[in-house]
Design a protein with these regions (language model features):
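N-terminal strand-loop element at the rim of the active site
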Residues: 28, 34-44, 50-57, 70, ...
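A conserved mid-protein helix/loop that constitutes part of the nucleotide-sugar donor-binding site
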Residues: 58-66, 246, 250-272, 279, ...
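A short, well-ordered alpha-helix in the C-terminal region of glycosyltransferases
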Residues: 375, 382, 389-403, 415
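C-terminal alpha-helical cap of glycosyltransferases
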Residues: 406-440
Length: 440
């Protein structure tokens, strides 16, 4: 590495280490917030759900909003969005749930808010991907949202918010961390903070068996209850695909992890062999121009389409015959469950950790080694050339997707929350109480 490259990396490491020191100091200063009184629960538990941006477009946002709908039948659900990052929600907000915004980016700001908004967050780890969207003013707003009124159960839905819940939630409130990835997917500095803080949770919910095994090893002896509850798929609109259109479909953010560069390269031989077929990639992101250049370089203009965002992905699935996922790493991708529910056979890299749990190779889809472009080409070629195989895998995929029905998964979550009712008696002395654990 030459000297000009080394200096920016050194400065970045120094900044991140300084931020970690300041973050620990801030958390230590805010510890008295955990000693506040929390009233006993009523007949219906007040459940507060922390979300990054309720108006965003990510898979985590969609799954959390979907889940909150059924939970309102048994509990009082309040969704607290750390940010209001867009004027209108992309996904429908659940009826019956209260939605509040900690930091409304579209509301008029006073002098203090404008000043603090210029400084980076102290409560969000610099290694967490949401750090760039947060500010010192967001920290203040989140603390207000957490402590203005008590709740019985607090559910946090991404690492930055789970850390906040574990470290600053008042004692007597049950905390559930809903981790949509896995411990191994985080950078080492963030991983260390996760292991240290997650020990204070009441329950940690993960999506896959490997993720559960990883956390059980890392949190051994902590007493945290670790459960595996997969994502749920809402009822799908319209009719499923009849697999008659010559379209291969992919969707996701145009970022490196989604592997669309590998998919485009894998599709190049298919375009020559089957000129009637088209690959459509839905989504937007920082790599759009780079992917467009790759399409032009490989002579795939008109054969591979970067179709941008769509609010009707299910409709696009109904007009496709194959779904393909080329990610280098995934949690439990909702889009696979939805594609299977729409009757599409799915071709996916066998990446950690979700796809191997969702797809049974040769039964309801095809799995190929992660990053193997030639194997991905061969799997797509096999499905395109064999309509009978497409139909057999697609029909079985619909049956497999029923295991992720929203009503079924919602009932599991409701039982989990209700089981936290006898959470520790509240200590009204104003002093921190000793940790008490709920049996697994």
């Amino acid at each position: 590495m030459n000297e000009p490259d080394r200096k920016p990396r050194l400065r970045r490491r120094v900044r991140r280490r300084a931020h970690r020191v300041l973050r620990r100091a801030a958390l230590w200063t805010l510890r008295p917030l955990r000693w506040r009184r929390v009233p006993p629960p009523g007949e219906r538990l007040h459940v507060r759900v922390l979300l990054q941006n309720a108006h965003g477009t990510g898979g985590t946002i969609r799954t959390v909003l979907n889940l909150c709908g059924p939970l309102t039948r048994d509990h009082d659900i309040e969704i607290v969005s750390a940010l209001k990052g867009n004027p209108k929600p992309f996904f429908p907000l659940p009826a019956g749930a209260a939605v509040t915004y900690a930091d409304d980016r579209f509301a008029p700001k006073g002098r203090t808010a404008r000043l603090l908004g210029r400084f980076p967050s102290l409560l969000i780890p610099a290694e967490e991907s949401s750090f760039r969207y947060m500010s010192l003013w967001t920290d203040v707003c989140l603390l207000r949202a957490l402590h203005r009124t008590p709740c019985d159960v607090l559910i946090a839905t991404r690492p930055s918010l789970i850390l906040l819940a574990a470290e600053l939630t008042p004692r007597g409130t049950a905390t559930i961390g809903q981790d949509h990835m896995s411990l191994e997917s985080y950078q080492p500095p963030l991983r260390r903070q996760v292991v240290r803080a997650y020990r204070r949770l009441t329950v940690l919910s993960v999506l896959t068996a490997p993720a559960r095994a990883g956390y059980e090893a890392a949190l051994a002896g902590s007493g945290v209850r670790i459960v595996r509850i997969p994502n749920a798929s809402p009822p799908l609109p319209g009719r499923p695909s009849r697999r008659e259109h010559e379209v291969v479909l992919a969707a996701g953010r145009l970022v490196a992890n989604k592997g669309f560069d590998l998919l485009i390269r894998a599709y190049a031989p298919i375009a020559a062999e089957h000129p009637g077929w088209t690959l459509r990639i839905f989504g937007s992101g920082l790599r759009r121009e780079r992917l467009a250049a790759l399409i032009a370089e490989l002579g795939l203009t008109g054969r591979v389409e970067l179709s941008g965002f769509t609010r009707d992905l299910h409709g696009e699935m109904a007009r496709a015959s194959i779904y393909v996922l080329s990610s280098r790493r995934e949690g439990m991708p909702m889009v696979i469950i939805e594609a299977m529910g729409m009757g599409l056979p799915v071709v996916s890299f066998d990446c950690p950790f979700g796809p191997p749990e969702l797809i049974t190779h040769g039964h309801d889809g095809l799995l190929v080694p992660t990053g193997d472009v030639d194997a991905l080409t061969a799997a797509l070629r096999e499905l395109i050339a064999d309509p009978g195989l497409r139909d057999r895998l697609g029909e079985q995929a619909r049956r497999s997707a029923r295991a992720y029905d929203l009503e079924h998964i919602g009932a599991r979550w409701s039982r989990l929350i209700s089981g936290l009712r006898p959470f520790p008696p509240h200590d009204f002395t104003g002093k921190p109480e000793k940790s008490r654990r709920i049996p697994a």
